[in-house]
Design a protein with these regions (language model features):
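Alpha-helical transmembrane segments of multi-pass inner-membrane proteins
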Residues: 1-13, 21-180, 263-301, 306-313, ...
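Extracytoplasmic/periplasmic ligand-binding sensor domains
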Residues: 26, 182-195
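Conserved glycosyltransferase catalytic-site signature
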Residues: 29, 132, 216-217, 254-255
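Luminal/periplasmic active-site loops of membrane-embedded glycosylation enzymes
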Residues: 57-74, 92, 194-214, 338
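TM-adjacent membrane-interface loops and short helices in multi-pass inner/ER membrane proteins
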Residues: 186-190, 198-250, 257, 264-271
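Membrane-water interface of transmembrane alpha-helices in multipass transporters/channels
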Residues: 319-324
Length: 341
Protein backbone atom coordinates (compact mmCIF):
# COMPACT_ATOMS: atom_id res chain seq x y z
CA UNK A 1 0.00 0.00 0.00
CA UNK A 2 2.82 2.41 0.86
CA UNK A 3 4.47 1.64 -2.47
CA UNK A 4 1.26 2.41 -4.37
CA UNK A 5 0.81 5.67 -2.46
CA UNK A 6 4.41 6.51 -3.30
CA UNK A 7 3.76 5.94 -7.01
CA UNK A 8 0.74 8.23 -6.92
CA UNK A 9 2.89 10.78 -5.11
CA UNK A 10 5.41 10.66 -7.95
CA UNK A 11 2.54 11.01 -10.43
CA UNK A 12 1.31 14.08 -8.55
CA UNK A 13 4.84 15.50 -8.46
CA UNK A 14 5.09 15.09 -12.23
CA UNK A 15 1.81 16.96 -12.65
CA UNK A 16 3.21 19.99 -10.82
CA UNK A 17 5.93 20.57 -13.45
CA UNK A 18 3.88 22.89 -15.65
CA UNK A 19 6.60 25.12 -17.12
CA UNK A 20 8.28 23.74 -20.24
CA UNK A 21 11.77 24.93 -19.25
CA UNK A 22 11.43 22.98 -16.00
CA UNK A 23 10.29 19.91 -17.89
CA UNK A 24 13.46 20.17 -19.97
CA UNK A 25 15.62 20.50 -16.85
CA UNK A 26 13.89 17.46 -15.37
CA UNK A 27 14.51 15.64 -18.64
CA UNK A 28 18.22 16.51 -18.40
CA UNK A 29 18.34 15.00 -14.92
CA UNK A 30 16.45 11.86 -15.97
CA UNK A 31 18.64 11.33 -19.05
CA UNK A 32 21.70 11.74 -16.84
CA UNK A 33 20.39 8.93 -14.62
CA UNK A 34 19.83 6.78 -17.69
CA UNK A 35 23.36 7.39 -18.96
CA UNK A 36 24.80 6.50 -15.55
CA UNK A 37 22.78 3.28 -15.30
CA UNK A 38 23.79 2.42 -18.87
CA UNK A 39 27.50 2.87 -18.11
CA UNK A 40 27.17 0.64 -15.05
CA UNK A 41 25.30 -1.94 -17.13
CA UNK A 42 27.94 -1.94 -19.86
CA UNK A 43 30.71 -2.38 -17.28
CA UNK A 44 28.76 -5.32 -15.82
CA UNK A 45 28.67 -6.94 -19.26
CA UNK A 46 32.42 -6.62 -19.93
CA UNK A 47 34.35 -9.58 -18.46
CA UNK A 48 37.34 -7.44 -17.50
CA UNK A 49 35.25 -5.02 -15.43
CA UNK A 50 32.32 -7.22 -14.39
CA UNK A 51 34.08 -8.50 -11.28
CA UNK A 52 34.45 -5.03 -9.77
CA UNK A 53 30.86 -3.85 -10.36
CA UNK A 54 28.11 -5.19 -8.03
CA UNK A 55 25.65 -7.42 -9.87
CA UNK A 56 23.15 -10.02 -8.66
CA UNK A 57 23.33 -11.66 -12.08
CA UNK A 58 27.08 -12.13 -12.37
CA UNK A 59 26.46 -15.85 -11.96
CA UNK A 60 23.22 -17.60 -12.93
CA UNK A 61 21.88 -20.62 -11.07
CA UNK A 62 21.99 -23.63 -13.40
CA UNK A 63 21.04 -26.61 -11.23
CA UNK A 64 22.21 -29.02 -8.57
CA UNK A 65 25.16 -31.38 -8.48
CA UNK A 66 26.76 -33.70 -5.94
CA UNK A 67 28.63 -30.69 -4.60
CA UNK A 68 25.50 -28.57 -4.18
CA UNK A 69 24.16 -25.75 -6.34
CA UNK A 70 25.96 -24.93 -9.58
CA UNK A 71 26.19 -21.60 -11.39
CA UNK A 72 27.32 -20.41 -14.81
CA UNK A 73 29.29 -17.23 -15.41
CA UNK A 74 27.23 -14.65 -17.27
CA UNK A 75 27.73 -11.00 -18.10
CA UNK A 76 24.29 -9.39 -17.93
CA UNK A 77 23.56 -5.68 -17.58
CA UNK A 78 21.36 -4.62 -14.66
CA UNK A 79 22.73 -1.20 -13.73
CA UNK A 80 22.12 -0.47 -10.07
CA UNK A 81 18.46 -1.47 -10.52
CA UNK A 82 18.81 -5.05 -9.20
CA UNK A 83 17.47 -6.91 -12.27
CA UNK A 84 17.75 -6.80 -16.08
CA UNK A 85 13.97 -6.44 -16.27
CA UNK A 86 14.07 -3.25 -14.19
CA UNK A 87 16.88 -1.89 -16.37
CA UNK A 88 14.81 -2.66 -19.47
CA UNK A 89 11.82 -0.71 -18.15
CA UNK A 90 13.86 2.28 -16.98
CA UNK A 91 15.90 2.60 -20.17
CA UNK A 92 12.74 2.31 -22.27
CA UNK A 93 11.30 5.39 -20.56
CA UNK A 94 14.53 7.39 -20.52
CA UNK A 95 15.49 6.53 -24.11
CA UNK A 96 12.29 8.24 -25.25
CA UNK A 97 13.38 11.44 -23.48
CA UNK A 98 16.90 11.21 -24.92
CA UNK A 99 15.84 10.51 -28.50
CA UNK A 100 13.21 13.25 -28.67
CA UNK A 101 15.48 15.79 -26.99
CA UNK A 102 18.24 14.93 -29.44
CA UNK A 103 15.87 15.43 -32.37
CA UNK A 104 14.04 18.60 -31.40
CA UNK A 105 15.89 20.62 -28.76
CA UNK A 106 17.45 23.90 -29.91
CA UNK A 107 20.68 23.69 -27.91
CA UNK A 108 23.60 21.88 -29.53
CA UNK A 109 25.19 20.89 -26.20
CA UNK A 110 21.98 19.19 -25.07
CA UNK A 111 21.63 17.41 -28.41
CA UNK A 112 25.16 16.00 -28.07
CA UNK A 113 24.61 14.95 -24.45
CA UNK A 114 21.34 13.23 -25.35
CA UNK A 115 22.88 11.52 -28.39
CA UNK A 116 25.77 10.08 -26.35
CA UNK A 117 23.38 9.01 -23.59
CA UNK A 118 21.07 7.37 -26.12
CA UNK A 119 23.93 5.35 -27.62
CA UNK A 120 24.98 4.16 -24.16
CA UNK A 121 21.42 3.23 -23.21
CA UNK A 122 20.92 1.38 -26.48
CA UNK A 123 23.99 -0.77 -25.84
CA UNK A 124 23.07 -1.41 -22.20
CA UNK A 125 19.49 -2.29 -23.09
CA UNK A 126 20.65 -4.92 -25.55
CA UNK A 127 23.08 -6.32 -22.97
CA UNK A 128 20.20 -6.83 -20.51
CA UNK A 129 19.43 -10.02 -22.48
CA UNK A 130 15.65 -9.96 -21.97
CA UNK A 131 12.70 -9.52 -24.33
CA UNK A 132 11.23 -6.32 -22.77
CA UNK A 133 14.55 -4.55 -23.29
CA UNK A 134 14.52 -5.21 -27.03
CA UNK A 135 10.77 -4.63 -27.32
CA UNK A 136 10.81 -1.35 -25.38
CA UNK A 137 13.88 -0.01 -27.14
CA UNK A 138 12.52 -0.96 -30.55
CA UNK A 139 9.21 0.72 -29.75
CA UNK A 140 11.00 3.96 -28.81
CA UNK A 141 12.82 4.10 -32.13
CA UNK A 142 9.88 3.05 -34.30
CA UNK A 143 7.33 5.35 -32.66
CA UNK A 144 9.75 8.30 -32.67
CA UNK A 145 10.57 7.62 -36.33
CA UNK A 146 6.88 7.65 -37.25
CA UNK A 147 6.28 10.89 -35.34
CA UNK A 148 9.34 12.49 -36.96
CA UNK A 149 8.13 11.44 -40.42
CA UNK A 150 4.69 12.97 -39.86
CA UNK A 151 6.21 16.06 -38.23
CA UNK A 152 8.47 16.62 -41.23
CA UNK A 153 5.38 16.75 -43.43
CA UNK A 154 3.80 19.45 -41.24
CA UNK A 155 6.92 21.55 -40.71
CA UNK A 156 8.63 20.91 -44.07
CA UNK A 157 11.81 20.26 -42.08
CA UNK A 158 13.36 16.89 -42.81
CA UNK A 159 16.27 17.18 -40.34
CA UNK A 160 14.55 15.52 -37.34
CA UNK A 161 13.34 12.64 -39.49
CA UNK A 162 16.80 12.13 -41.01
CA UNK A 163 18.42 12.33 -37.56
CA UNK A 164 15.94 9.78 -36.18
CA UNK A 165 16.55 7.49 -39.14
CA UNK A 166 20.30 7.74 -38.57
CA UNK A 167 19.80 6.98 -34.86
CA UNK A 168 17.68 3.97 -35.82
CA UNK A 169 20.40 2.71 -38.16
CA UNK A 170 23.10 3.28 -35.52
CA UNK A 171 21.01 1.33 -32.98
CA UNK A 172 20.71 -1.46 -35.53
CA UNK A 173 24.48 -1.34 -35.99
CA UNK A 174 25.05 -1.63 -32.24
CA UNK A 175 22.70 -4.60 -32.10
CA UNK A 176 24.37 -6.25 -35.11
CA UNK A 177 27.83 -5.74 -33.61
CA UNK A 178 26.84 -7.24 -30.26
CA UNK A 179 25.03 -10.10 -31.97
CA UNK A 180 28.03 -10.85 -34.19
CA UNK A 181 30.35 -10.88 -31.17
CA UNK A 182 28.05 -13.34 -29.35
CA UNK A 183 27.42 -10.75 -26.63
CA UNK A 184 23.68 -10.71 -27.38
CA UNK A 185 21.47 -13.57 -26.26
CA UNK A 186 18.03 -13.79 -24.70
CA UNK A 187 18.14 -15.41 -21.27
CA UNK A 188 14.69 -14.54 -19.95
CA UNK A 189 13.82 -17.90 -18.41
CA UNK A 190 17.18 -18.37 -16.68
CA UNK A 191 17.08 -14.81 -15.35
CA UNK A 192 13.49 -15.17 -14.12
CA UNK A 193 14.20 -18.31 -12.12
CA UNK A 194 17.57 -17.10 -10.85
CA UNK A 195 15.88 -13.93 -9.60
CA UNK A 196 13.08 -15.84 -7.90
CA UNK A 197 15.02 -18.79 -6.48
CA UNK A 198 18.51 -17.47 -5.81
CA UNK A 199 18.15 -13.70 -5.28
CA UNK A 200 14.77 -13.62 -3.52
CA UNK A 201 14.51 -17.22 -2.24
CA UNK A 202 10.74 -17.32 -2.69
CA UNK A 203 9.96 -20.01 -5.29
CA UNK A 204 11.36 -23.07 -7.02
CA UNK A 205 14.18 -23.55 -9.46
CA UNK A 206 12.23 -23.98 -12.69
CA UNK A 207 9.17 -25.40 -14.38
CA UNK A 208 7.32 -28.31 -12.91
CA UNK A 209 7.03 -30.21 -16.21
CA UNK A 210 8.91 -30.83 -19.44
CA UNK A 211 6.92 -28.54 -21.72
CA UNK A 212 8.83 -26.58 -24.33
CA UNK A 213 6.27 -23.75 -24.33
CA UNK A 214 7.83 -20.29 -24.30
CA UNK A 215 8.26 -19.14 -20.71
CA UNK A 216 6.01 -16.07 -20.99
CA UNK A 217 2.72 -17.78 -22.01
CA UNK A 218 3.57 -20.47 -19.45
CA UNK A 219 3.72 -17.87 -16.67
CA UNK A 220 0.72 -15.97 -18.03
CA UNK A 221 -1.41 -19.13 -17.79
CA UNK A 222 -0.47 -19.49 -14.12
CA UNK A 223 -1.19 -15.82 -13.49
CA UNK A 224 -4.60 -15.88 -15.17
CA UNK A 225 -5.59 -19.02 -13.26
CA UNK A 226 -4.71 -17.30 -9.98
CA UNK A 227 -6.58 -14.15 -11.07
CA UNK A 228 -9.70 -16.17 -11.89
CA UNK A 229 -9.66 -17.72 -8.41
CA UNK A 230 -9.43 -14.27 -6.77
CA UNK A 231 -11.24 -12.19 -9.36
CA UNK A 232 -12.89 -9.37 -7.41
CA UNK A 233 -10.42 -8.45 -4.68
CA UNK A 234 -7.24 -10.17 -5.85
CA UNK A 235 -4.68 -11.96 -3.72
CA UNK A 236 -3.19 -8.81 -2.22
CA UNK A 237 0.35 -7.56 -2.81
CA UNK A 238 1.97 -10.65 -1.27
CA UNK A 239 0.50 -13.42 -3.40
CA UNK A 240 3.15 -16.08 -2.72
CA UNK A 241 0.88 -18.20 -0.52
CA UNK A 242 -1.95 -18.23 -3.06
CA UNK A 243 0.41 -19.05 -5.91
CA UNK A 244 1.99 -21.87 -3.92
CA UNK A 245 -1.38 -23.41 -3.03
CA UNK A 246 -2.54 -23.30 -6.66
CA UNK A 247 0.55 -25.18 -7.83
CA UNK A 248 2.05 -22.32 -9.83
CA UNK A 249 5.82 -22.18 -10.21
CA UNK A 250 6.45 -18.52 -9.45
CA UNK A 251 4.66 -15.61 -7.77
CA UNK A 252 4.85 -13.26 -10.76
CA UNK A 253 3.44 -13.68 -14.28
CA UNK A 254 5.91 -11.33 -16.00
CA UNK A 255 3.01 -9.46 -17.51
CA UNK A 256 2.29 -6.29 -15.57
CA UNK A 257 -1.40 -6.30 -16.51
CA UNK A 258 -1.97 -9.89 -15.37
CA UNK A 259 0.01 -9.18 -12.19
CA UNK A 260 -2.25 -6.21 -11.49
CA UNK A 261 -5.39 -8.28 -12.05
CA UNK A 262 -4.27 -11.19 -9.85
CA UNK A 263 -2.94 -9.08 -7.00
CA UNK A 264 -5.41 -6.14 -6.93
CA UNK A 265 -8.55 -7.68 -8.38
CA UNK A 266 -10.97 -6.70 -11.11
CA UNK A 267 -12.14 -3.40 -9.60
CA UNK A 268 -8.66 -1.87 -9.28
CA UNK A 269 -7.70 -3.36 -12.65
CA UNK A 270 -10.69 -1.69 -14.34
CA UNK A 271 -9.95 1.66 -12.67
CA UNK A 272 -6.31 1.44 -13.78
CA UNK A 273 -7.35 0.72 -17.38
CA UNK A 274 -9.64 3.77 -17.29
CA UNK A 275 -6.72 5.87 -16.01
CA UNK A 276 -4.46 4.54 -18.77
CA UNK A 277 -7.06 5.26 -21.45
CA UNK A 278 -7.44 8.83 -20.18
CA UNK A 279 -3.65 9.20 -20.21
CA UNK A 280 -3.37 7.83 -23.76
CA UNK A 281 -6.03 10.30 -24.94
CA UNK A 282 -3.99 13.13 -23.44
CA UNK A 283 -0.86 11.73 -25.09
CA UNK A 284 -2.54 11.75 -28.51
CA UNK A 285 -3.52 15.39 -27.99
CA UNK A 286 0.04 16.27 -26.95
CA UNK A 287 1.52 14.68 -30.06
CA UNK A 288 -1.09 16.38 -32.26
CA UNK A 289 -0.25 19.71 -30.60
CA UNK A 290 3.46 19.08 -31.13
CA UNK A 291 2.85 18.52 -34.84
CA UNK A 292 1.31 21.99 -35.01
CA UNK A 293 3.97 23.59 -32.76
CA UNK A 294 1.45 24.22 -29.98
CA UNK A 295 3.69 22.63 -27.35
CA UNK A 296 7.37 21.72 -27.02
CA UNK A 297 9.17 18.45 -27.62
CA UNK A 298 8.79 17.36 -23.99
CA UNK A 299 5.12 16.57 -24.68
CA UNK A 300 6.16 14.23 -27.46
CA UNK A 301 8.91 12.71 -25.28
CA UNK A 302 6.68 11.90 -22.30
CA UNK A 303 4.00 10.49 -24.59
CA UNK A 304 6.48 8.17 -26.28
CA UNK A 305 7.96 7.22 -22.89
CA UNK A 306 4.59 6.21 -21.41
CA UNK A 307 3.43 4.36 -24.53
CA UNK A 308 6.67 2.38 -24.89
CA UNK A 309 6.62 1.47 -21.20
CA UNK A 310 3.08 0.15 -21.62
CA UNK A 311 4.23 -1.96 -24.58
CA UNK A 312 7.17 -3.59 -22.81
CA UNK A 313 5.00 -4.14 -19.70
CA UNK A 314 3.41 -7.13 -21.46
CA UNK A 315 6.70 -8.95 -20.76
CA UNK A 316 7.79 -7.26 -17.54
CA UNK A 317 6.82 -6.69 -13.92
CA UNK A 318 6.35 -3.68 -11.69
CA UNK A 319 9.37 -2.91 -9.52
CA UNK A 320 10.25 -0.23 -6.98
CA UNK A 321 13.43 0.44 -8.97
CA UNK A 322 11.68 0.95 -12.32
CA UNK A 323 7.98 1.85 -11.92
CA UNK A 324 8.68 5.33 -10.44
CA UNK A 325 9.95 6.48 -13.85
CA UNK A 326 6.68 5.50 -15.48
CA UNK A 327 4.63 7.36 -12.89
CA UNK A 328 6.74 10.50 -13.22
CA UNK A 329 6.35 10.37 -17.02
CA UNK A 330 2.59 9.83 -16.69
CA UNK A 331 2.39 12.80 -14.32
CA UNK A 332 4.23 14.92 -16.87
CA UNK A 333 1.65 13.94 -19.50
CA UNK A 334 -1.10 15.22 -17.23
CA UNK A 335 0.89 18.35 -16.36
CA UNK A 336 0.15 19.81 -19.79
CA UNK A 337 -3.52 20.13 -18.87
CA UNK A 338 -2.80 21.40 -15.36
CA UNK A 339 -2.81 25.12 -14.52
CA UNK A 340 0.26 26.65 -16.17
CA UNK A 341 2.60 28.78 -14.11
Amino acid sequence: MLTILGYWGLFAAGMTVTADDRRIKLSDFIVGIGAFEAIVGILQAIPATAKIVPNYFKEIFSGFSSGGMTYTKEYIATGFLCTPFALAAVLTVISAFALNGMLYDDKKARKIFYAISLALMTAADILACVVPAILGLGAVYVISLIIAAVKSGFAKDKKPFIACLVAFIVAGGIFTGLFASNEFRLMDEKIIFHDSFDRLSITGTGRGDDTEQWIYPYLWDDGMYTAEQNLIWGTGPDNWGTIFESGAIIDRSYNEYIDLLQSRGLIIFALTIVFLIMTIVKMCKLVAGFMKDKNGWTGCAVSAAVLCYLIQAFFNISSVTSSPYFWIAAGLVWSFTAVKS
